[in-house]
């Protein structure tokens, strides 16, 4: 039949076949009974009730959909149901016999009971699109996975989180791919986990998440078997099972097992957010001699007026850090370009010297965070600009000794991105001000002649610097629903150190205004705040960077009265594997 009006009450007997072909939706109210078979063709939806589902033969859904629309379960007497490619069965139904979901076929579950066995080579859709978790599929017989897909909705949180569920009274076997959609869950630590699949018989089937993991807030969930009395069942757990899932998982013969005592698992994206906010506040941070080399080489006041100058510096660096109880290992590479020049120079007493200048810069950083708990990684990117002013005062311009004070302020703006395997990229911006005050005092420690007819003057320079770091990310919500709030803006970084250097002049350079000044310095650096990210309220912070030790060595050279060069390399070391290595090259031209 292909028209509803052509079918009244029917009895399919003597192994007969009733074929219903429709391109439109039918609500079948007539009785269909007997021992024969029914085949559904066409793209339309055929809705059955208890009377029209009373036949006992085989059902073949070749096209379109057979639906059960009642609030109470419809009893389908068919002893075997085959859902073919492009076929769909849906609704609140209790079947008398077996159901076979073939490749391309779909079983949509509400409150569904399979009276016999269930084979899944297509899709068993536990979750209604965008709907609340709570659908239950009960299989009174055995379940066999033929590399089919099973989808669930769950509100990812603790053990008692709402979820769709499958309850198999018999045995499980074969391989099944699993997809879990998070519906409003903010993530939490689990103990035993969120139960998705309960097995009453022999639990030999393998179930694996299609993405290896599913995320909510700062937590990563994996699918694993239970322990003890729950060893047959399958759970979503945010506890580490000691096995790192592969990037593109397949069901495995030895599935992971929930460890209630294991540590929670954090998302690698947390490391990328932390790296980005730390970079936003530190990329353009610098010291007096980073910006100007040895300013007194060629900036000394001339009798005819003040010298004008332009400077530029290039910085490359590599940072290694950890976060999330050591789970997240981040490496970051950065590049910084800054340039500027003096607007004015003057002296208040014919001995000291004042500078006022402007500067601007461009910087970028790319970071990679690898988790030692889950099988995917995260990438962070940040790029942006800065512009601002600096001012410097020297107590004694003539003999290079005495006190100095340097200050600067910058406005910084950045574009940020965090992306990870098989997950949507998250783009956001950051804005804010950084500012610094630095002071030091230079002592002449001695003068001696070198073996190569050089005259060497040894200087020692204690230094102190306070930097306020006020760049803040925009709070926002990721496409997956995770609320992102970074922490650490407003950090006050304190640096205490000492620099010692030799000013060397060779006799052959007499009258050439050429000087050479190697140096080494050591610093202690303290950060008042920890850079961190809050993901749905769960905070993950960078480790080992509150207190740092630093060593730098470099050289400052005066080529002639107009040109000077400087460069250095430095290493910072902290706790828990934190390290930062940097190289810098600067040039200044005066006229």
Label the model's feature ranges.
Residues 49, 67, 90, 169, ...:
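Transmembrane beta-barrel domains of outer membrane proteins
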Residues 78, 449-454, 507-516:
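Flexible, glycine/charged-enriched surface loops at secondary-structure junctions
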Residues 108, 153, 184, 411-413, ...:
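Transmembrane beta-strand segments that form the barrel wall of outer-membrane beta-barrel proteins
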Residues 187-203, 326-345, 484-491:
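Short secondary-structure subsegments characteristic of cysteine-rich extracellular domains
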Residues 251-451, 568-570, 575-582, 588:
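Outer membrane beta-barrel translocator domains of Type V secretion systems
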Residues 388, 470, 479-591:
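Outer membrane beta-barrel transmembrane domains
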């Amino acid at each position: 039949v292909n028209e509803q009006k052509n079918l009244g009450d029917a009895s399919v007997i003597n192994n007969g076949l009733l074929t219903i072909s429709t391109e439109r939706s039918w609500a079948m109210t007539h009785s269909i009974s007997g021992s024969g078979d029914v085949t559904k063709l066409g793209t339309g939806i055929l809705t059955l009730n208890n009377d029209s589902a009373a036949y006992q033969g085989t059902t073949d859904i070749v096209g379109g959909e057979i639906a059960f629309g009642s609030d109470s379960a419809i009893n389908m007497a068919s002893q075997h149901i085959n859902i073919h490619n492009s076929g769909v069965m849906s609704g609140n139904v209790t079947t008398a016999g077996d159901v076979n979901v073939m490749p391309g076929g779909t079983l949509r579950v509400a409150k569904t009971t399979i009276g016999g066995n269930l084979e899944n080579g297509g899709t068993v859709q536990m979750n209604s699109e965008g709907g609340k978790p709570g659908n239950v599929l009960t299989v009174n017989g055995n379940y066999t996975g033929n590399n089919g897909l099973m989808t669930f909705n769950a509100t990812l949180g603790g053990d008692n989180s709402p979820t769709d569920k499958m309850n198999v009274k018999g045995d499980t076997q074969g391989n099944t791919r699993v997809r879990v959609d998070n519906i409003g869950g903010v993530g939490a630590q689990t103990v035993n986990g969120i139960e998705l699949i309960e097995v009453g018989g022999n639990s030999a089937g393998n179930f694996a998440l299609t993405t290896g993991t599913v995320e909510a807030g700062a937590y990563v969930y994996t699918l694993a078997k239970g322990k003890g009395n729950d060893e047959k069942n399958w759970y979503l757990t945010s506890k580490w099972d000691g096995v790192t899932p592969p990037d593109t998982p397949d069901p495995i013969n030895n599935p992971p097992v929930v460890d209630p005592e294991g540590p929670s698992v954090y998302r690698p994206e947390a490391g990328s957010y932390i790296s980005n906010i730390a970079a936003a506040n530190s990329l353009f941070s610098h010291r007096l001699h980073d910006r100007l080399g040895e300013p007194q080489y060629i900036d000394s006041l001339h009798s005819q007026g003040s010298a004008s100058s332009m400077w530029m510096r290039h910085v490359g660096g590599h940072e290694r850090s950890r976060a999330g109880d050591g789970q997240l290992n981040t490496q970051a590479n950065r590049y910084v370009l800054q340039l500027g020049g003096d607007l004015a120079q003057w002296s208040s007493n014919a001995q000291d010297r004042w500078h006022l200048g402007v500067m601007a810069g461009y910087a970028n950083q790319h970071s990679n965070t690898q988790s030692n708990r889950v099988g995917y990684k995260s990438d962070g990117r940040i790029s942006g600009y800065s512009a601002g002013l600096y001012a410097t005062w020297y107590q004694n311009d003539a003999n290079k000794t005495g006190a100095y004070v340097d200050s600067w302020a910058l406005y910084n703006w950045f574009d940020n991105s965090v992306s990870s395997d098989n997950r949507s990229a998250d783009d956001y911006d950051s804005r804010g001000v950084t500012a610094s005050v630095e002071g030091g005092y230079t002592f002449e420690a001695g003068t001696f002649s070198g073996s190569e007819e050089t005259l060497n003057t040894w200087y020692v320079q204690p230094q102190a610097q306070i930097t306020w770091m006020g760049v803040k990310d925009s709070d926002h919500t990721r496409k997956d629903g995770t609320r992102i709030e970074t922490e650490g803006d407003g950090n006050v970084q304190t640096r205490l150190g000492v620099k010692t250097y030799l000013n060397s002049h060779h006799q052959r350079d007499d009258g050439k205004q050429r000087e050479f000044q190697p140096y080494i310095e050591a610093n202690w650096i303290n950060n008042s705040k920890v850079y961190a990210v809050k993901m749905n309220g769960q905070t993950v912070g960078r480790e080992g960077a509150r207190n740092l030790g630093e060593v730098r060595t470099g050289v400052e050279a005066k080529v002639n009265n107009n040109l000077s060069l400087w460069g250095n390399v430095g290493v910072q070391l902290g706790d828990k594997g934190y390290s930062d290595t940097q190289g810098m090259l600067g040039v200044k031209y005066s006229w």
